[in-house]
Curated annotation (Swiss-Prot):
A zinc finger (C2H2-type) spans 586-608, 614-636, 642-664, 670-692, 698-720, 726-747. Coiled coil: none annotated. Residues 750-798 are annotated as: Disordered. Residues 758-769 have a biased composition (Acidic residues). Keywords: DNA-binding, Metal-binding, Methyltransferase, Nucleus, Repeat, S-adenosyl-L-methionine, Transcription, Transcription regulation, Transferase, Zinc, Zinc-finger. It is found in: Nucleus. May function as a transcription factor involved in cell differentiation. This is PR domain zinc finger protein 4. Belongs to the class V-like SAM-binding methyltransferase superfamily. It comes from Rattus norvegicus (Rat). InterPro entries: PRDM4, PRDM4_PR/SET, PRDM4_Znf, SET_dom, SET_dom_sf, Zinc_finger, Znf_C2H2_sf, Znf_C2H2_type.
Length: 798
């Protein structure tokens, strides 16, 4: 075949045939060996095509699949050829016309595959009953055994039939087994490619669909001769069983292997479909938009597909890849339109041809319209331009899980141990009544020190064989039950519940009869207290050093010893801060401060120059020392690792805790360098030093006292007028400012409290205007109800 010569003279003769008088050309016209004789198939039938080649032979899907011209004229065609070398005359080829591609080229390709060329059948020559209405033969039979039965070429498309192998069929072959061919059984996959720019018309769809194939018995066909036998698949005569019918658009033909591919014009393919049995086409016919000018039609069925296998076609010098048998899934089959198959009729539902993906179009449509206007009866991307926005009615808010799970015998009220909510009894709860288990969030890897003090009180540690297994966090009301609101007792008298672990869970059990209107207050069991490292009884005071004190007076005395041991030099410290044990040889040139390293001196000097490169990400504050920034960040994160064992207050710095502990002892260890006055807190000493260092220009008209600010003078004038509007509800003390009353309430526990209240901590080193020098604190006498505005006046009264 490589030595084939297509002479120009022969080409001119071939091109002289007109479209209306097209002559099919065989291999004898081209100087090739004559192909085996074949008989023309009857005109009625289903158009089929040669099976596709594998990707190894051609870059196109098939070297034997044809895209026939859309009409009679000069429209182009596409054809894939095997990767073989052919001797052809040099270009150009003015003699090649469309008739060459419709008649000559199919014959060449068919000869290469040792298969007969396609037979051309015009659909108008077929009646509704399937018989030939008009048989036209324009070519003498002597020229080629394969004759065209119509004078009009293909215009609209093809329907392809692929060869498949069915396990249940016998291995029969149309050709003799001469070593060049393999036995094939036949299955049919129909695919209609219609080159129309508008949906297929649904007119005239009440006709019968027939499929004619060509089969032959292997034992009856000698070498060089072939017989033809039509097979029909319709809705009346054929009953296909599930084991012999394929799946996904594959319909097997009962008989021997398919020999002759038939190509038919499909202008009105829908007019040939009617009354298809559900056993043949049990699902539907689907259309998928392939391009703007073509539609692909696939027939799908729900029969078993397991019996189909791949098959290979062999020929001398030509090898076809195995024909893969694959099903048409529902997602692939359901495209932009479908044909519903019913027992009455087969109707086609047209759809618009689109190039874009249908799924993306649906998503775009879903996101485009968001609001439906019932008055306009349409959707809008936003509010209706005519009727405005719609009215939304929100759901009724529901309470958290913790509050909804509260038993009916209990209620939630303000706790007596703090500002949080506590659990109170609505009726009598008998002794040995168990509540639980405690429900919360489990954490298997958690650092308790990273939690705030409030969160630590809601952390329950669960141990297994003495090893911490996990923790139960009870901070989220939506994740916990009502037991998260039960508070811890401060002493033995308040305790009425015992908390203990069991099987990895926490339970509360009443230790006494609890009458109504009493708060549930728990403390840990003896074993559980030992596991978590707390005292066995709530009234035992535990020091940081590990010493347990049975009474508050004993614990206070023990705490005083710690203060003297840890702060020996703070009694005579200057306003610049405490002295250090290490030698401070790096002195500042702008102030008398000294440092133990040049890096600390450099950071300190940046403060004098106003350089603060370290800024806080949460607020606008900046610092020259990065350590001060780290300390400041604890304010935003709420991390307070230093906790007071007496009042459960927590602090971000150890120095603040030590300063706070002085409040409980009542000792004044900080002495002013300018006078002999003593103070408990360093902040109070710092404010007092301003009296000696800063000049006061605002003078009181009644007592000639000087103040730094006008607001300080106004507060001082209230003392002359006797206005002490801020009175403690627990005792008889009254204060000039709300700040001093708030500070007093934090330490006031008894009506006869003697010491002035002190704030727990001032993170920024400034308590505000109320705490600046000149703001005076009133003190009350224990023996009488007299109130005084200064410590000196109170001492004189005593």
């Amino acid at each position: 075949m490589n030595d084939m010569n297509l002479s120009p003279v022969g080409m001119e003769q071939l091109s002289s045939s007109s479209v209306s008088n097209a002559l099919p050309v065989s291999g004898s016209h081209l100087g090739l060996a004559a192909s085996p004789s074949h008989s023309a198939i009857p005109a009625p039938g289903l158009p089929v095509a040669i099976p596709n080649l594998g990707p190894s032979l051609s870059s196109l899907p098939s070297a034997l699949s044809l895209m026939l011209p859309m009409g009679i004229g000069d429209r182009g065609v596409m054809c894939g050829l095997p990767e073989r070398n052919y001797t052809l005359p040099p270009p150009p080829y003015p003699h090649l016309e469309s008739s060459y591609f419709r008649t000559i080229l199919p014959g060449i390709l068919s000869y290469l595959a040792d298969r007969p060329p396609p037979q051309y059948i015009h659909p108008n020559s077929i009646n509704v009953d399937g018989n030939t209405a008009l048989s036209i033969t324009n070519n003498p039979s002597a020229l080629d055994p394969y004759q065209a039965n119509g004078n009009v070429g293909l215009e609209l498309g093809i329907v392809s039939i692929d060869s498949r192998s069915v396990n249940t069929h016998g291995a029969q072959s149309l050709h003799p087994n001469d070593g060049h061919e393999v036995a094939l059984d036949t299955t049919i996959t129909m695919e209609n490619v219609s080159r129309v720019t508008s949906p297929i018309s649904t007119d005239g769809m009440a006709e019968e669909l027939t499929m004619d194939g060509v089969t032959g018995e292997h034992s009856q066909i000698p070498n060089g001769s072939r017989s033809h036998e039509p097979l029909s698949v319709d809705s009346v005569s054929n009953n296909l069983t599930a084991d012999t019918v394929g799946h996904g658009g594959v319909i097997p033909i009962h008989g021997n292997g398919l020999e002759l591919p038939v190509v038919m014009e499909t202008d009105h393919i829908a007019n040939r479909v009617n009354g298809i049995s559900d056993s043949v086409l049990s699902d539907s016919i689907h259309t998928v938009a392939m391009s703007t000018n073509s539609v692909s039609v696939a027939l799908s069925t729900s029969h078993n597909f397991a019996s189909l296998e791949s098959v290979s076609l062999q020929e001398v010098g030509l090898s076809l890849e195995p024909v893969a048998v694959s099903s048409i899934t529902q997602e692939v089959a359901m495209g932009t339109g479908h044909v519903d198959v019913s027992s009455d009729s087969l109707s086609f539902v047209p759809s618009s041809l689109q190039m874009e993906d249908s799924n993306s179009n649906k998503e775009n449509m879903a996101t485009l319209f968001t609001i439906w206007c019932t008055l306009c009866d349409r959707a809008y991307p936003s509010d209706c331009p005519d009727h405005g926005p719609v009215t939304f009615v929100p759901d009724t808010p529901i309470e958290s899980r913790a509050r909804l799970s509260l038993p009916k015998q209990l209620v939630l009220r303000q706790s007596i141990v703090g500002t949080d909510v506590g659990v109170w009894t609505a009726e009598t709860i008998p002794v040995r009544t168990c509540f639980g288990p405690l429900i919360g969030q489990q954490s298997h890897s958690m650092e308790v020190a990273e939690w705030t003090d409030k969160a630590v009180s809601h952390v329950w540690k669960i141990y297994h064989n003495g090893v911490l297994e996990f923790c139960i966090i009870t901070t989220d009301e939506n994740e916990c039950n009502w037991m998260m609101f039960v508070r811890k007792a401060r002493n033995r008298e308040e305790q009425n519940l015992v908390a203990y672990p069991h099987d990895g869970k926490i339970y509360f059990c009443t230790s006494q009869d609890i009458p109504p209107e009493n708060e549930l207050l728990f403390y840990y069991s003896r074993d559980y207290a030992q596991q978590i490292g707390v005292p066995e009884h709530p009234d035992v005071h535990l020091c940081n050093c590990g010493k347990e004190c049975s009474s508050y007076s004993e614990f206070k005395a023990h705490l005083t010893s710690h203060i003297h041991n840890h702060l020996p030099s703070q009694g005579h410290s200057s306003s610049h801060g405490p002295s250090h044990s290490k030698e401070r040889k790096w002195k500042c040139s702008m102030c008398p401060q000294a440092f133990i390293s040049p890096s600390k001196l450099h950071v300190h000097f940046m403060g004098h120059m106003g350089m603060k490169p370290h800024k806080c990400d949460f607020c606008s504050k900046a610092f020259s020392d990065p350590s001060n920034l780290r300390t400041h960040l604890k304010i935003h994160t709420g991390q307070k690792n230093y906790r007071c064992t007496l009042c459960d207050k927590s602090f971000t710095q150890k120095a603040h805790l030590e300063s706070h502990m002085v409040i409980h002892t009542g000792e004044k260890n900080l002495k002013c360098d300018y006078c002999d006055k003593l103070f408990m807190r360093r902040q109070d000493l710092k404010q007092h030093v301003l009296i000696h260092t800063q000049e006061r220009q605002i003078k009181c008209p009644k007592c000639d006292k000087l103040f730094l600010r006008t607001n300080h003078l106004k507060k001082h004038l209230n003392s002359h007028e006797g206005r002490r509007d801020y009175v403690c509800e627990k005792c008889t003390k009254a204060y000039l400012t709300k700040y001093h009353l708030t500070r007093h309430l934090k330490a006031c526990k008894e009506p006869a409290s003697s010491s002035s209240a002190q704030d727990d901590e001032d993170e920024d080193g400034d308590s505000g205007e109320d705490g600046l020098p000149g703001s005076m604190t009133t003190e009350g006498c224990r023996m009488s109800s007299a109130v005084y505005s200064a410590d000196e006046s109170l001492s004189a009264h005593k």
